[in-house]
Structures are given as structure tokens and as C-alpha cells.
């Protein structure tokens, strides 16, 4: 097994950064189940991009590192996929050729679709209102809800015919994307979206009641209470709720307040808000999916291309544990064109993998965090996760959070073990010198179009170094963490038991 610490370029000392700390790791501490909710699903560029080999290669790379199960993308109903058409008399016709290639490609690589039902086919739209993405999706309601229901039903029936109900019943169907902002121009926004959802749920469930449907897929954690109430009061099917949040969303938009909420806290504060709304609703316990989240919705190389993502991700897992069934990082790849075709490999794209198949520090962070166990042990620290694998070995994440692009303070953590029979561990590090491709990219002059030789060099430079063997002496182990540092410690159990001191 390989592991690493992420050392960042620099970072501002924040409330999460700390100088020195002793952490007691007690194998007999209270614990709870720790499902890997953060790596079950990833977002990606729109539907048609899934046909590219570069997309599929990146998918295979991330699948190998995380074993993720679902992928979500926009625009399966966009005209470029070609599913919907009408003849001169207005009679609908359907063509599932590209859709089949899209879903065949996902399933062949061991990933199921989380189907976002969007956007509106031009010939079905009530108005030709385009959102400003490069591919200009139509974001108006349908002009004829009977035809919309027909499209949804024909689509679902075709999927079942091709893949079988036992397969498709394991997928999820989400109605639209972020209807509370500029992806929906129905009036009023909430009421017209609820109408869309009602018709969609009706059509889908009439094909087969085992198909799973949910929403509202809102930005900024919006509408959850009202949406559940609408479904309950009108007996509308609801198998899960979904929404989105980004760490730089404003408190005004997410909470309706002027409270200052740090980037490190925003995502999981929103997760707690939604969790509490669901538990207080008519559908307590309904699964909660964050079908988009990230540290930023801007393109910022100091965030999504930088080691900053390691501590931010680790701390997000710590804070969001128990608040959601699944979170979908936006996105797994920079095969992505919402703002246009990328002009260089590192522009602050959302993806874990840059153009040319170059893994970023965020990819390495996910790869490292995949090593965590499936039980979480209680620990008195805001900078650590202590987990246990099914066979009993302990895996610990440690981090030193600092705000992106500014300087922070190095720290040292001392682990003191109790009820742990171990004299050695493996320590994995990722920093500006190890596993961060940024330095090599700058060294070669930041080429806009790296040559094939340069791409090979960049991919090599992005690799995590082998885990270092470290000794546990007198039940103690010290780990140095720079600002933006993330470490994974895998404790190696002794063959014979030792008495803790």
C-alpha cells in the first residue's frame, strides 16, 4: 500500500491550523460505522463528453483509486444527444443511439449512471431560453407536459429493455439541475419546478415502480423543506432528496443570514441544515444526496489545482460524517466545457485529473482517503480521523488546514497509542515536493500545450511517493505537517500482542 502527506505552497493560519498537538489513539475507544459516503459518486462534464476516450480513461483512473459507483452529468436530453425530435405534425420520435453508447461506456467501466433528467429538447420547450454554458442548454419548462411525460416514459422503458429492470432499479433518476437559479425559467420558479417534478415522477413510476426518483437538485441547499412537504401533501413519489453546495457559497444564499462562515465549514454546515430539515419533515430518514459539492464554484488554481484540497477534503469528511448518504464531488475530470474548451492544463478546473490525464493533488487526496477504514473511533481532535478496517488495522488521517494561497504555520502532531499492539507504521506524504505536479509544470515553463514527452513527465511527477516505514517507540509516533499538509498513517499490527504503556 502507498500513502502520502500533502504539503502545500503556502496558507493562511486559520482556526483549523494548529502548532503542536498530542492525540490519544485508543483502539478501545467508542466507535461507529464510517461508510465511505464521499467517494461513492462523482460529477462530470455533460452527457455527450462521456463518449470521448479521454473521459473514459480518466473515469478508469478515478475508479481504480476510489472504486466509485455512480457518475452524474448534465444534459442527457440536450439536442446534441439526439433523443427527442418531432415531425412536421408535431408527433414525437425518439432516438436512443447515443444514449446507449453513453450508458454502455459507463457500465463497461464498472460505474452506474445517476441520471439527471435535463435539459429541455428545443422542440419541446415552451420558450427558447438558453443558459450561458458553452453548449447553450434550454432551461424552459415543456410546452406540453403530455409530451414531456411521453419522453420520460419512453426513455425509462428503453433503458429497462436494454439493461433489464434488475440493473436499472439500482440507478437513480434526479429531476433537473439547480432550478432555483438560472437553470430554470419557469414562473414561479419553485411552483413550476414542483409541477415538472410531479409529471416526471408520475411518468417514471408508471413505467416501473422500482425506479428511484428524487430532487430538487437545488443550488445552495435550497427548497428542501418545501419540496418534501409538497411531495407528502400531494402523494408524489420521493425516493431521495438531493441538493448542492460549494464552500464559497454565501451565508445569505444558503442560510439567509449575514454570519461569516469559513470555507472549511460551509459544506458541512449546509449538510447539517438539510439533515435537520429532513428529520423534521414528513419523510424523516429519506436518503440525502449532495449531488454537487466542491471547495469552490470558481476556477481557482490555488484551490482545485493545489494541495489545499487535501486538508479541506479530510476535514469535510470529518464534519459531514453522519449527515448524508452520498456526496458527489464536482468533478472527476477536466474533460469539461461549461465555460468553453480549456486552454491549458492547470486553470483551476473542477476535475481531479487535468487535461492530458494528469492527476492533480485532489486526486491524490481522494486516493489517500480511500485507505481509511469503515469504523470511526472517537478521538479528541479536530485535525484527525482515526478509523479501523474490517481486519482490525488502524488507519489515521492527519491534516494542517490553512486558507488557500496564503501562508500558514507548520505543526507537529504526537500520536500516543493505547491498546494498540504495534511497533511500526506506514506514512504517506503528499506536498509540493511529493505528489504535487505543480512544481514540475512550472519548471518546464508552464506550457499551454505540453508535448507528449512533457505529459509523460508531468504524469510521473504527479505520482505519490512510496509510503515510508516509521517506528512507533514507546507507543508514540510524531508526524510533522506543513500548512495544507495531509498525512495517512497505517498502523502495522505486531504478530504478537504488546502491552500498552
Q: PLM features: what roles do these ranges have?
A:
Residues 419-477:
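Acidic, Ser/Thr/Pro-rich beta/coil linker or hinge segments at domain junctions
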Residues 18-69, 483, 495-501:
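Mature N-terminal, pre-catalytic/accessory segment of carbohydrate-active enzymes
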Residues 12-14:
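N-terminal signal peptide c-region/cleavage motif recognized by signal peptidases
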Residues 382-439, 443, 483-490:
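Carbohydrate-binding surface patches
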Residues 66-262, 273:
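Substrate-binding cleft and catalytic face of glycoside hydrolase catalytic domains
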Residues 41, 106, 155, 173, ...:
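Conserved, mostly hydrophobic/aromatic
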Residues 238, 245-281, 297-307, 339, ...:
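Substrate-binding surface in catalytic domains of secreted glycosidases
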Residues 289-408, 431:
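Aromatic/acidic polysaccharide-binding cleft in carbohydrate-active enzymes
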Amino acid at each position: 500500500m502507498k500513502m502520502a502527506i500533502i504539503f502545500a505552497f503556502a496558507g493562511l493560519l486559520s482556526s483549523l491550523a494548529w502548532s503542536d498537538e498530542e492525540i490519544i489513539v485508543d483502539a478501545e475507544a467508542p466507535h461507529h460505522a464510517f461508510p465511505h459516503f464521499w467517494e461513492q459518486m462523482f460529477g462530470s462534464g455533460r452527457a455527450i463528453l462521456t463518449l470521448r476516450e479521454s473521459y473514459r480513461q480518466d473515469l478508469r483512473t478515478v475508479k481504480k483509486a476510489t472504486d466509485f459507483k455512480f457518475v452524474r452529468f448534465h444534459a442527457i436530453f440536450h439536442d446534441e444527444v439526439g433523443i427527442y425530435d418531432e415531425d412536421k405534425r408535431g408527433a414525437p420520435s425518439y432516438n436512443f443511439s447515443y444514449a446507449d453508447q453513453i450508458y454502455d461506456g459507463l457500465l463497461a467501466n464498472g460505474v452506474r449512471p445517476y441520471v439527471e433528467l435535463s435539459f429541455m429538447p428545443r422542440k419541446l420547450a415552451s420558450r427558447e431560453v438558453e443558459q450561458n454554458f458553452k453548449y447553450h442548454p434550454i432551461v424552459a419548462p415543456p410546452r406540453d407536459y403530455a409530451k414531456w411525460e411521453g419522453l420520460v416514459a419512453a426513455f425509462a422503458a428503453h433503458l429497462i429493455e436494454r439493461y433489464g429492470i434488475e440493473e436499472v432499479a439500482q440507478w437513480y433518476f434526479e429531476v433537473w439541475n439547480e432550478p432555483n437559479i438560472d437553470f430554470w425559467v419557469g414562473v414561479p420558479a419553485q411552483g413550476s419546478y414542483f409541477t415538472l417534478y410531479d409529471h416526471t415522477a408520475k411518468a417514471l413510476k408508471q413505467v416501473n415502480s422500482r425506479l428511484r426518483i428524487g430532487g430538487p437538485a437545488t443550488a445552495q441547499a435550497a427548497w428542501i423543506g418545501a419540496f418534501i412537504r409538497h411531495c407528502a401533501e400531494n402523494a408524489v413519489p420521493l425516493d431521495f432528496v438531493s441538493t448542492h453546495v460549494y464552500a464559497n457559497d454565501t451565508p445569505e444564499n444558503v442560510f439567509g443570514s449575514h454570519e461569516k462562515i469559513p470555507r472549511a465549514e460551509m459544506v458541512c454546515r449546509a449538510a447539517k441544515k438539510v439533515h435537520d430539515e429532513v428529520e423534521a419533515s414528513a419523510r424523516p430518514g429519506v436518503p440525502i444526496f449532495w449531488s454537487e459539492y466542491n471547495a469552490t464554484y470558481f476556477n481557482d488554481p490555488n484551490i482545485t489545482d493545489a494541495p489545499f484540497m487535501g486538508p479541506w477534503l479530510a476535514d469535510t469528511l470529518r464534519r459531514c460524517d453522519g449527515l448524508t448518504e452520498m456526496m458527489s464531488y464536482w468533478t472527476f475530470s477536466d474533460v469539461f466545457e461549461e465555460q468553453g474548451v480549456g486552454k491549458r492544463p492547470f486553470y483551476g478546473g473542477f476535475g481531479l485529473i487535468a487535461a492530458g490525464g494528469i492527476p492533480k493533488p485532489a486526486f491524490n487526496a481522494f486516493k489517500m482517503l480511500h485507505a481509511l477504514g469503515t469504523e470511526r473511533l472517537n478521538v479528541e481532535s479536530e485535525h484527525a480521523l482515526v478509523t479501523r478496517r474490517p481486519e482490525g488495522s488502524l488507519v489515521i488521517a492527519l491534516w494542517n488546514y490553512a486558507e488557500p494561497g496564503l501562508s500558514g504555520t507548520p505543526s507537529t502532531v504526537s500520536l500516543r497509542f493505547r491498546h494498540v499492539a504495534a511497533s511500526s507504521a506506514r506514512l504517506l506524504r503528499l506536498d509540493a515536493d511529493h505528489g504535487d505536479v505543480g512544481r514540475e509544470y512550472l519548471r518546464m515553463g508552464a506550457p499551454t500545450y505540453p508535448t507528449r514527452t512533457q505529459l509523460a513527465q508531468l504524469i510521473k511527477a504527479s505520482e505519490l511517493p512510496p509510503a515510508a516505514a516509521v517506528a512507533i517507540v514507546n507507543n508514540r509516533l510524531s508526524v510533522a505537517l506543513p500548512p495544507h499538509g495531509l498525512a495517512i498513517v497505517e498502523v502495522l499490527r505486531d504478530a504478537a500482542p504488546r502491552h500498552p504503556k
